[in-house]
Curated annotation (Swiss-Prot):
Any Gene Ontology biological process: translation
SUPFAM superfamilies on file: L21p-like (SSF141091)
Function as written in the Swiss-Prot or TrEMBL entry: This protein binds to 23S rRNA in the presence of protein L20.
One CC-aspect GO term: ribonucleoprotein complex
UniProt cross-references to Pfam families, sorted A to Z: Ribosomal_L21p
GO MF entries: rRNA binding; structural constituent of ribosome
Assembly description: Part of the 50S ribosomal subunit. Contacts protein L20.
Species this protein is from: Rickettsia akari (strain Hartford)
UniProt-listed NCBIfam families: L21 (TIGR00061)
Protein name according to UniProt: Large ribosomal subunit protein bL21
PROSITE patterns membership: RIBOSOMAL_L21 (PS01169)
PANTHER family the UniProt entry points to: 50S RIBOSOMAL PROTEIN L21, LARGE RIBOSOMAL SUBUNIT PROTEIN BL21M
């Protein structure tokens, strides 16, 4: 069984026991969280349920396995011949989740 969940403004396709990295979610390591904004749920051999915009009664349960930071990206702006240069770096904080269960009532 798989589901498409909405977390942090992005969509993720998840299976049971899969590990995903999403934007930072506050919580302790080992704590369980539930996603109720499920956009689609289905099985590989049966028809899927597509939400309008979410599937009612569907819940994905996940466990926080790690809090980490992504690789650093460099943002560089320049205007030629004007001696204008700006350099900034950014590291996005991420949360690693293990999907425990996908249910639909």
């Amino acid at each position: 069984m798989f589901a498409v969940i909405k977390a942090g403004g992005k969509q993720y396709k998840v299976d049971r026991n899969s590990i995903i990295k999403v934007e930072k979610i506050d919580g302790e390591l080992g704590s369980k969280i539930q996603f109720d904004q499920i956009l689609m749920i289905g099985e590989y051999s049966k028809p899927s349920f597509i939400g309008t915009p979410i599937v009612k009664g569907a819940v994905v349960t996940a466990e926080i396995t790690n809090q980490l930071k992504d690789n650093k990206i460099i943002v560089f702006k320049k205007k030629r011949r004007k001696n204008y240069r700006r350099k900034a770096g950014h590291r996005q904080e991420l949360t690693e989740l293990k999907i425990l269960d996908i249910t639909k009532q």
